[in-house]
């Protein structure tokens, strides 16, 4: 496991694939500013996810067939497709892992929202893309990430 950014963790490459995960409960607890609004927190989390994704792209730019895969309830399908991801059916093993981690998901979502929040497991999607398709969409990813960072800077000034 490797931190690609504050809230994005990647597994070691295996069978030409890297699986990505959101940060841990400790990451959320110790990183999120207690005085930040829910919107600021969500923008920071999304910004860091994209920053981590861009770091993976930069680190593996020569392996165009390398696949990146992850499951989330945070990213909507339309945005994921703009970034070069395809939607895949979440496999049963991954769904069971998410169900077992549901208390942790409640805590991380609640930290982000600044109130008790329950993730909807029906909204979980698995996204997959290779480095080539992500590189083709890198400008879009950077544009979204920069907009989130600008929004954070504006809110903190």
Which stretches of residues belong to each language-model region?
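Acyl-donor binding region in acyl/amide transferases
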Residues: 13-83, 87-104
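Terminal substrate-recognition subdomain of acyl/acetyltransferases
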Residues: 1-12, 67-157
């Amino acid at each position: 496991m490797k931190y690609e950014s504050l809230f994005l963790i990647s597994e070691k490459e295996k069978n030409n694939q890297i699986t990505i995960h959101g940060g841990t409960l400790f990451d959320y607890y110790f990183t999120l500013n207690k005085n930040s609004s829910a919107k600021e927190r969500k923008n920071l989390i999304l910004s860091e996810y994209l920053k981590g994704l861009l770091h993976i792209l930069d680190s593996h730019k020569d392996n165009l067939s390398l696949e990146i895969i992850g499951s989330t309830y945070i990213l909507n399908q339309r945005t994921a497709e703009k970034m070069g991801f395809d939607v895949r059916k979440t496999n049963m093993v991954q769904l069971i892992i998410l169900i077992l981690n549901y208390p942790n998901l409640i805590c991380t979502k609640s930290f982000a929202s600044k109130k008790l929040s329950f993730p909807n497991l029906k909204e979980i999607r698995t996204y997959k893309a290779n480095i080539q398709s992500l590189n083709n969409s890198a400008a879009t990813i950077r544009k979204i990430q920069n907009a989130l960072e600008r929004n954070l800077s504006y809110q903190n000034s």
